Amino acid sequence: FMSSREQILDAIRQSLGRPELSTDAKRALNQQITSHPANLVPARAKGERAQLIKQFQNMAQAAACTVETVSNLVAVPAAVSQFLRANNLPTRITLAPDEWLSGLDWNSNNLLKTKIGSADIADMVSVTPAFAGVAETGTLVASSGSAHPTTLNFVPDYHVVVLRHTQIVGSYEEVWARLRKANKQGRGFTVP
């Protein structure tokens, strides 16, 4: 007896004209899925930390991101406020209910009005922490979960992402390794 899932997959396989996989082929595929073999890592994803940070910044800017470097995390609220003012954007922001992000002194800047939680259609600007940044492509990796509502990544018109230098990795392979490690530590991250 086949489950509904097996019936659907069997119908797809038949429509593609593919024979059923042999036991050895199934075993090899399962081994590959569980062992997480690394793919080819391009040269631009390798290098010293300073090189990777510069590569990330260049690639992110090439993808139309604004990159602002601050001296420490305490300076993040002021940098966000300055960016919003300089670009004539709303100063009402929705923060991810992330422990370290919401622990910053957002009230030190009288121009910002903050809300903590998920985003709704009225929210124009969100501020979230990144899970990682990929130097290879300038990609920001966002996570989702109770402290990182995925609506903050997609609903507001403007998304400010706080990324620490230590979160910048060379390749996607490093992101997947960090994500697997975080999930083993019980943090329950997913990538939207």
Sequence positions of predicted segments:
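The feature marks the mature, well-folded catalytic cores of soluble enzymes
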Residues: 1-192
